[in-house]
Amino acid sequence: MESAYLHKFLGTCLTEGLAELARMRPVDPIEYLALWIYKYKKNVTMEKQRQEEMAQLEHEREVALMEQEMMERLRAEELLFQQQQLEFQLELEEQEKERQRIEELERAQEQFEKELRMSMENMAKEDTLHGEDGADSGKTLAEISDRYGAPNLSRVEELDEPMLSDVALNIDQDL
């Protein structure tokens, strides 16, 4: 049982220590073996500590990479958010401009309708003042159509045209 324990827990250490003892052949082999085992244990502890530190450093490196990726994602999200805010603000400005343009058009339409009503009222007043006699007082169709909203008709002067009977007489004379 003691040999199994020694073999299991001290096998490699004792084997290497005895091999070193045989190679060096010190004056006091027991003291040399004790110091060698002490140094072996110290080296094993240092190696274990170094591996733990390496594992810790690897873990910290992974955490740093994850934090860096998270920061990049946050920056990307922030840029996207800023871009969306800018687009939203531009859209609001466009809507405001469109609303102002519509209000301006409505005001212009109201002004136009007001002027049209006033013009119609003025025409109605003129018609009532002149009466129906005034309408037959010699105004031509072109003069009547000069009012606001009436079609623009050009004046046509009448030329003296020969009558059909005059043309027939001329033909008879030629024969």
From Swiss-Prot:
Sorted keywords for this record are: Cell projection, Cilium, Cytoplasm, Cytoskeleton, Flagellum
Q: Does the keyword Transmembrane apply?
A: no
Q: Determine if Cytoplasm is one of this entry's keywords.
A: yes
Q: Which residues cross the membrane?
A: none
Indicate the segments annotated as coiled coil, or none if absent: none
List cystine links: none
**What InterPro entries has UniProt attached to this entry?**
Dpy-30_motif, DYDC-like_DD, Sdc1/DPY30
Tell me the protein family, please.
Belongs to the dpy-30 family.
Q: How does it assemble?
A: Component of the axonemal radial spoke complex 1 (RS1), at least composed of spoke head proteins RSPH1, RSPH3, RSPH9 and the cilia-specific component RSPH4A or sperm-specific component RSPH6A, spoke stalk proteins RSPH14, DNAJB13, DYDC1, ROPN1L and NME5, and the anchor protein IQUB. Interacts with SH3GL3.
Q: This chain belongs to which protein, by name? A: DPY30 domain-containing protein 1
Q: Which organism is it from?
A: Bos taurus
